[in-house]
Amino acid sequence: MNPLISASSVVAAGLAIGLAAIGPGIGQGTAAGYAVEGIARQPEAEGKIRGALLLSFAFMESLTIYGLVVALVLLFANPFS
């Protein structure tokens, strides 16, 4: 395999997982902050808020998992070699 392609794949894999984690990380922090604020305002709605928060966390985390899959494909099943 060409060393340039191998090195580029490693850099691309690092960027894929790094950039895929930034957005969901910021989104999860913001969502958790607003959920805590909502629970503080209406403690009786805690169950509904928590359920919606956990569901949204799952959707946000799936974006990071997609980035991980792309990184693993670039590392182990390199389509460019």
Curated annotation (Swiss-Prot):
The chain crosses the membrane at residues 7-27, 57-77. Pfam families: ATP-synt_C. One of its GO terms (molecular function) is proton-transporting ATP synthase activity, rotational mechanism. It is a multi-pass membrane protein. The record marks 61 as: Reversibly protonated during proton transport. GO terms for cellular component: chloroplast thylakoid membrane; proton-transporting ATP synthase complex; proton-transporting two-sector ATPase complex, proton-transporting domain. It is found in: Plastid, Chloroplast thylakoid membrane. Keywords: ATP synthesis, CF(0), Chloroplast, Hydrogen ion transport, Ion transport, Lipid-binding, Membrane, Plastid, Thylakoid, Transmembrane, Transmembrane helix, Transport. It comes from the Eukaryota. HAMAP family: ATP_synth_c_bact. F-type ATPases have 2 components, F(1) - the catalytic core - and F(0) - the membrane proton channel. F(1) has five subunits: alpha(3), beta(3), gamma(1), delta(1), epsilon(1). F(0) has four main subunits: a(1), b(1), b'(1) and c(10-14). The alpha and beta chains form an alternating ring which encloses part of the gamma chain. F(1) is attached to F(0) by a central stalk formed by the gamma and epsilon chains, while a peripheral stalk is formed by the delta, b and b' chains. F(1)F(0) ATP synthase produces ATP from ADP in the presence of a proton or sodium gradient. F-type ATPases consist of two structural domains, F(1) containing the extramembraneous catalytic core and F(0) containing the membrane proton channel, linked together by a central stalk and a peripheral stalk. During catalysis, ATP synthesis in the catalytic domain of F(1) is coupled via a rotary mechanism of the central stalk subunits to proton translocation. In plastids the F-type ATPase is also known as CF(1)CF(0). Belongs to the ATPase C chain family. This is ATP synthase subunit c, chloroplastic. It comes from Bigelowiella natans (Pedinomonas minutissima). The gene is atpH.
